[in-house]
Structures are given as C-alpha cells and as structure tokens.
C-alpha cells in the first residue's frame, strides 16, 4: 500500500488511490452549518492544510492506453458586480515587503518550468480586481483548531476546493465552520482584510469515493464544493452570495481544454492561484504559470491514479486553489481567430498534493471529471438551486 504523509498535523495514514467511475448518487453532504456568529476562527494563526506524497517520483508514468470518460463539458462563469464590504479581521505582526517584479521561469528536479509570483505588484492590489478576486482563503475548524486552504467560486453561491479541505477521511467525518474570504489580503500596515466580505457555508459536498475510509480514495476524487450563505452589506443593504459580488469562474470536466483529453501526455497551460504559507506567510495571493501534463501515478499492488502535474513553488495553504485555463480577457481580434476551447477563466482542477521533498518543485491535482466535480456540483445545485441559477 502506498502512503501519503499528512503533514498538517505530523500524522501519517495509508491511502490507496484507485481509478473508478462514480454513480450519480455517489456523493456525501455534511450536516447544515448553523453557526452564524463571528469570532470563532483564528485567522492570524490558522494551520495550513498540506498533503504530501511519499511514494517515489518514479511512480509518475505515461501509459498508452486511452482513458474513457464522457464528452468534455464546460460551465461558463460570470463577472459579478464588484461591490466591496471592506471587513477588518484583526492585526498581523510580521512585515511583508512588496515585490515589484515577476520572477523568471525556474524549475526543480522534476524539470517542470514554472513562474510563481505575487498577484499584487508595483503597489497595485490586483488581487481585488476581476478575475483574481474570485479566489480567496478558506478557513475552517478541525476540532478546536483553525485550518486554512484556498478556494474559488464556480457558481454565485458555490465554492470549489480540495476534498481534503472539507472531509477528514482518517477520522471519517467532515470538518466544520467553513468560511470563505475572497481576495483575502494582509500586511503589517492594514492588518487582515476581507475586501469583499466573509461568507459562511451552509453545507459541504464531496464524492463518497473520497470519503469512504475503507478505500481512502484521494487523487481521483480530491475535489469538493461548499454551498455558501449570503452576506449582507450594512452600508448598502444588499444581501448577496460571494459570486454575485466577485463573479465566479467557469469549470470544465472530462479533459476540456487539454490537447488530447485525459489521455497521458495530454497538455495544457495552467494559471494556478492560491495562498501558500511559504510565500508572504500566506497573507497575499500568489499566481503560478506552468504547462500541465496528464499522467498516471503507479501506486503499486496494481493500483493507479490519474494526476495533472505542474511545476510550482507553492506549498501548504495552496490546497484547493484553482487551476485555470485561458486566464484573463481575450483581446479584440483582427486577422486571426480563437483556437479550440476558447472560453476564459475555466477551472479544470484544484491544488491537491505535493512531494515530501521540496526539491521537485512540482504539484499534482485531480483532473475534473463527471465522476467528481460535476457529481458534487450537480448534487449541491439540485439541493440548493438558488445558489446556481
């Protein structure tokens, strides 16, 4: 049995990752979250979620057998109205100096080039601008401790993140008290800020194949969604879901946007967003660009898992952050035309795991399929359609 090391608490647990197709009913939802009071989360001292693989890098392989899924699909995003709330969350103690230039392309021992840099540069708070503002930090409780991941909106009231930021399959139970803060920002001058407000969750959804403690499926199903509550603006009287203010990304599944679907060797250009604590203490949004490749991970004993691999310097705290195709806004075209899969700002995976060693500078993610992301989004939207219409 292959093992992953869960470094968020220093504990280890065995995980077997197997490739299978989930049925339409194979989803698990949390109890409704009834705590609407503020003050229960420790924003300044939250512990980053961080899943690290301890199997050999040689386990990453490329196989020739084609992978069969349904047709590629996509659900488009929207811009939102941009209304700010400017909530203050408390003080911080360590000075963060501004970085004014993007870093050059680099790579680790995995030989996957990447460029990781702050989103905010040249004194400009670009993290508050569309489409960056759709991404944010996700705080939640594991017992009495506050943990943190990254996340983003993919419907006006639906937030996507990694399943391991929602469900503890070592204890076979959901975490609690999730709170999403889009465009989170902090430094020693302004403290901890929520420019578009903070949003509590109503309920969480994960694939049952991930939650099943017997199978311990992770890589093929490490994606989940949160159904959010509205947040009132005391200045304007409006009451909105996060995606109504910040906008929301689209999402694609079953190989949407890749050069050869979900077959091994298929590639795409990923723009990754998140809040790794290894960069600016996790106070500022980081962006990473890298070519993604679909591979098969050989876990031994006949078990394999799908993975999308990129080069990245991001670490713990980036879990659940979006991996996007076609990031930004296409210009007015003249004398040329858009290529295949031209939709902008489409999430096709979320940050899932990295290696135990820092040397590879590589991260892996579950590719979105109709057996994971579409399954949980459809379940959440069927249960609470007002978050999705």
Question: What does each model-found stretch correspond to?
Answer:
Residues 138, 151, 157, 161, ...:
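Terminal peptide-recognition signature
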Residues 24-150, 379-389:
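Protease-domain processing segments flanking chymotrypsin-fold serine proteases, especially trypsin-like
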Residues 1-11:
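Bacterial N-terminal signal peptides that target proteins for export
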Residues 219-311:
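Chymotrypsin/trypsin-fold serine protease catalytic domain
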Residues 312-350:
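Catalytic nucleophile loop of clan PA
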């Amino acid at each position: 049995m292959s093992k992953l090391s869960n470094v968020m608490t220093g504990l280890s647990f065995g995980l077997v990752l197997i490739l299978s197709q989930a049925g339409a009913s194979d989803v698990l939802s949390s109890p409704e979250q009834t705590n609407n009071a503020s003050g229960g989360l420790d924003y300044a001292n939250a512990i980053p979620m961080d899943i690290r693989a301890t199997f050999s890098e040689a386990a990453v392989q490329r196989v020739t057998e084609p992978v069969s899924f349904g047709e590629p699909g996509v659900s488009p995003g929207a811009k939102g109205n941009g209304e700010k709330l400017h909530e203050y969350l408390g003080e911080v103690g360590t000075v963060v100096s501004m970085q004014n230039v993007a870093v050059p392309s680099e790579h680790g021992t995995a030989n996957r080039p990447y460029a990781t840099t702050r989103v905010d540069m040249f004194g400009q708070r670009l993290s508050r601008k569309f489409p960056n503002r759709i991404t944010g930090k996700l705080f939640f409780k594991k017992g009495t401790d506050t943990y943190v991941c990254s996340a983003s909106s993919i419907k006006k009231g639906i937030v996507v993140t990694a399943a391991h930021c929602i469900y503890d399959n070592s204890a076979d139970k959901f975490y609690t008290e999730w709170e999403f803060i889009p465009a989170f920002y902090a430094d020693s001058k302004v403290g901890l800020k929520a420019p578009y407000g903070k949003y509590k969750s109503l309920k969480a959804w994960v694939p049952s194949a991930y939650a099943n403690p017997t199978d311990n499926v992770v890589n093929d199903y490490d994606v989940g969604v949160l159904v959010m509550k509205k947040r009132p603006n005391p200045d304007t009287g409006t009451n909105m879901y996060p995606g109504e203010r910040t906008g929301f990304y689209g999402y694609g599944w079953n190989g949407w946007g890749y050069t050869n679907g979900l077959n091994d060797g298929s590639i795409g250009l990923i723009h990754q967003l998140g809040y790794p604590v290894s960069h600016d203490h996790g106070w500022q949004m980081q962006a990473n660009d890298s070519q993604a490749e679909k591979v098969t991970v050989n876990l031994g004993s006949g078990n394999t898992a799908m993975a999308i691999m990129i080069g990245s310097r991001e670490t713990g705290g980036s879990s659940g952050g979006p991996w996007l195709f076609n990031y930004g806004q296409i210009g007015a075209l003249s004398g040329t035309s858009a290529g295949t899969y031209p939709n902008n700002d489409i999430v096709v995976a979320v940050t899932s795991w990295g290696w135990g060693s820092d040397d590879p500078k590589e991260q892996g993610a579950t590719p979105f399929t109709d057996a994971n992301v579409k399954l949980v989004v459809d379940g959440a939207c069927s249960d609470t359609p007002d978050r999705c219409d």
